[in-house]
Amino acid sequence: MISTVLRRSILGTSRRTLAASVTSINAALFHNLAPAAATVSDLANGATNVKSLPSNSSPFGVKVRDFHVKSVPSEFRSSIVSSAGFAAQEYAPSYENDGGIGDSESVGSSGGGDGLAIADLGISPEIVKALKGRGIEKLFPIQKAVLEPAMEGRDMIGRARTGTGKTLAFGIPIIDKIIKFNAKHGRGKNPQCLVLAPTRELARQVEKEFRESAPSLDTICLYGGTPIGQQMRELNYGIDVAVGTPGRIIDLMKRGALNLSEVQFVVLDEADQMLQVGFAEDVEIILQKLPAKRQSMMFSATMPSWIRSLTKKYLNNPLTIDLVGDSDQKLADGITMYSIAADSYGRASIIGPLVKEHGKGGKCIVFTQTKRDADRLAFGLAKSYKCEALHGDISQAQRERTLAGFRDGNFSILVATDVAARGLDVPNVDLVIHYELPNNTETFVHRTGRTGRAGKKGSAILIHGQDQTRAVKMIEKEVGSRFNELPSIAVERGSASMFEGVGARSGGSFGGGRSGGGGYGSYGSSSGRSGGGSYGGYGGSSGRSGGGGGSYGGSGGSSSRYSGGSDRSSGFGSFGSGGSSGGFGSDRSSQSSGRSSFGGFGSNDGKRSY
């Protein structure tokens, strides 16, 4: 009857909200009547030792939902955590390990031993069933290393490679504790778990992992580029797990839409990337607003000083788990690395042959340095392949459609900038191609980590200039893996016409190039007569060319012979030739328009620089 009344009176309410309200009232009526009746009976008989009801209780037990008649959406959850105890401690099973768990554990890349059966973990049957439906019945040993101390309620900091499956490892204990907590105390309105991620893509991936592993929990993904009003309404209905980027989290906190006072679990995923993308201050603001009594977990591929500072300030006697060990290898074991030399004018034309030979007919991601290169390369490849571009100038809605199409196999090649390198939720990527040298080793690792995930095989190919062999060796040393050098692919110069202007620079980071700014991470320059490069420069020119096309509508900056940047000219770009928009290169031309605009860290031997 209650269900019928609710359906008739709240027709505008969402199906999820209606179901939640019916469940809550039924739970209150049928599970709490007996204790309430016993209490009333004892009081009538004059008993004096009867335990008083909690302050937020009714004769039917603890309140589960509050119904408010006002213009905003109905609040179907009430705050009950403060009177219910602490889930992280209440449901922490005691794992017995020989010698106990110390302050530090190290797990190699393979972990050793067989996988841990999920059914043997003693977790909620709902989780076991959901994971089995996804084909997940065992955890890798590397995941077990995270899961067991997480189940104990320990704070931890984990050093993990990309693609190790750590999301599931820390997610299972959290959702299991929340499910058991809700079953005993009822569901509160405010989130019990907060996960911070540096990118939208990673946030969406983590939220999806939580949602699919525990369908009964309400999860939300909070990031910019989407209507904030819709997110505020969802938060008002009640949320168990909130996953998001720090910027949007703070925005919602300032608006009073997100209350973190009941958070019992906080996770910082890819914490080192938070620092790189400028979220360091936001992260600390959020951590300061959380309850002191909580379980905190932090995962990072590297341990810069900022991460160590966070650990001391916000984690309680954390267990350090090293999922990499003493090995210098930073990539998963299943990834095979290749390198191939190519001139700037022919670089785009060898993508097709590489995909045919190494792509195995599956998914391939090509990473470029700039949005302009991504667009132009995707346009050229689309003449022969099903291909799309993904970068920061594309709207969030279009990005999601593009990623969905790539996941579903509607097209096989995705050309992307580094906006997609972290947390890209695309399973079964067989091949990653680095269109040019990345800015640093970390970028290389996270690009390459899109393949070979969760124990699967994959390949990564690095395209480099003839004069960048030293840079390739430096990457090998930093990553701890060796490249297999592929034979050069002959390309007729006429066949490169459809890619004219794409990737004209041959520089990139790690130096290289006769005039380029030299050392590791310095965005070295191209050599000979080739020009400065498009949209962001990444190298200056040497020789007689004025640098070819600069950014924003330039011709791409290939050598004057192919792209129109005539000798002693400043090319076609709007910012000049020496590596525009932060070019970090050098320019030896006496007539060029000068060194990098926007403060490029290069040298300039010209006599007329500006």
Swiss-Prot record:
Binding site for ATP: A160, R161, T162, G163, T164, G165, K166, T167
Entry remark concerning the domains of this protein: The Q motif is unique to and characteristic of the DEAD box family of RNA helicases and controls ATP binding and hydrolysis.
An annotated GO cellular component: cytosol
Record-given protein name: DEAD-box ATP-dependent RNA helicase 9, mitochondrial
Molecular-function annotations in GO: ATP binding; ATP hydrolysis activity; DNA binding; RNA binding; RNA helicase activity
CDD domains linked: DEADc (cd00268), SF2_C_DEAD (cd18787)
Residue span of the annotated presequence: 1-66
Family: Belongs to the DEAD box helicase family. DDX21/DDX50 subfamily.
Biased composition (Gly residues): 542-557, 573-585
Enzyme class: hydrolase
Motif (DEAD box): 269-272
EC nos: 3.6.4.13
Keyword Signal tagged: no
Domain Helicase ATP-binding residues, every copy: 147-321
Record region (Disordered): 542-610
InterPro entries documented for this protein: DEAD/DEAH_box_helicase_dom, DEAD_box_RNA_helicase, Helicase_ATP-bd, Helicase_C-like, P-loop_NTPase, RNA_helicase_DEAD_Q_motif
Gene: RH9
Key word Cell cycle present: no
Short sequence motif Q motif: positions: 116-144
One biological process term in Gene Ontology: viral RNA genome replication
SMART domains: DEXDc (SM00487), HELICc (SM00490)
Start-end of Low complexity biased regions: 558-572, 586-596
Catalysis performed (reactions): ATP + H2O = ADP + phosphate + H(+)
